[in-house]
Amino acid sequence: MTQEIFNIDYNFLNLFPLTLHHLQIDEFENKKQELIKFAYNLRETTNCTHNSNKGGWQSNVYKVNGDNFLESLLLNIFKSIPAFNDKIELESFYWLNINPTGAYNTKHNHPNSDLAGVLWLKIPKDSGDIVFISPKDFESFIELFSYTDEFKKKTNNYHIYNFPPKEGTMLVFPSFLQHKVEENKSNDDRISVSFNIKIKHEHFTMR
C-alpha cells in the first residue's frame, strides 16, 4: 500500500509557560570592579558555606536591605522588572559565589522562596553555563524523542537547557526549577550573586 502524505494546516499552542526573566544591567562596566572587589573582600572577612557548591566559595545569606552598594543595586533592579505589577512586595536574600578553576554547583533548587536568580559579575570564557532541568514528568521526557530538532528549538522544548552566562546580566526564574552550574574550565575565577525572592501581596502569599 502506498503511503499518502497530506498537506495540512498545522499550528501549535504552548500552554502553561515557564517564564525566565533575562535582564541586561545598564552601565554595568562602571560598577563591575567595585562589585568584584566587594565579593573578594567578603570572602576574606567571612566564613564559607558550601550548599550546592563543590570546590568554590559561597558567602553566608544576607537580606537585601539596601545597606551597601550591592544591595542597593539589587533593590533597584528588582523594582525595574517590567513584568511585576505594583501590588506586590518583594522580600529578597542574596549570597555571593566565587568558583575558581575546577569548581561547579551540583543540581539543586531554591526552597522556601518564590523566585530565584543570579547576577553575573565576572564570567571568563569556558567558566560554566547554568543548566536548567525540565520539571516535566518522565512521560513528557519520552515525548521529546518524537519531535524534530527544528520543532524542539522553535518551542524551547528540551529536557535540559544550557544558558550561557554573560557579565552584567541577570536571570530570574521560578525557585522550584532544578538547575546546576557547569565546571569552571577557565584559568580565572567565575563570580556571581545568587538570590531568592519571596513575593508578598495584600491578598495572598505565593509560598
Residue spans of the language-model regions?
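Non-heme Fe(II)/2-oxoglutarate
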Residues: 2-86, 104
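Preference for bulky hydrophobic residues occupying beta-strand positions
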Residues: 23, 96, 119, 195-197
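Short conserved micro-motifs at the rims of enzyme active sites and ligand-binding pockets
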Residues: 34, 184, 204-207
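Active-site region of the double-stranded beta-helix
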Residues: 64-94, 100-114, 119-126
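Catalytic core of non-heme Fe(II) oxygenases with the double-stranded beta-helix
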Residues: 99-172, 189, 202-206
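Histidine-centered metal-chelating micro-motifs
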Residues: 103-104, 176-180
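Short beta-strand segments enriched in hydrophobic/aromatic residues
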Residues: 121, 177, 197-199
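Ligand-binding loop in jelly-roll beta-barrel domains
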Residues: 182-192
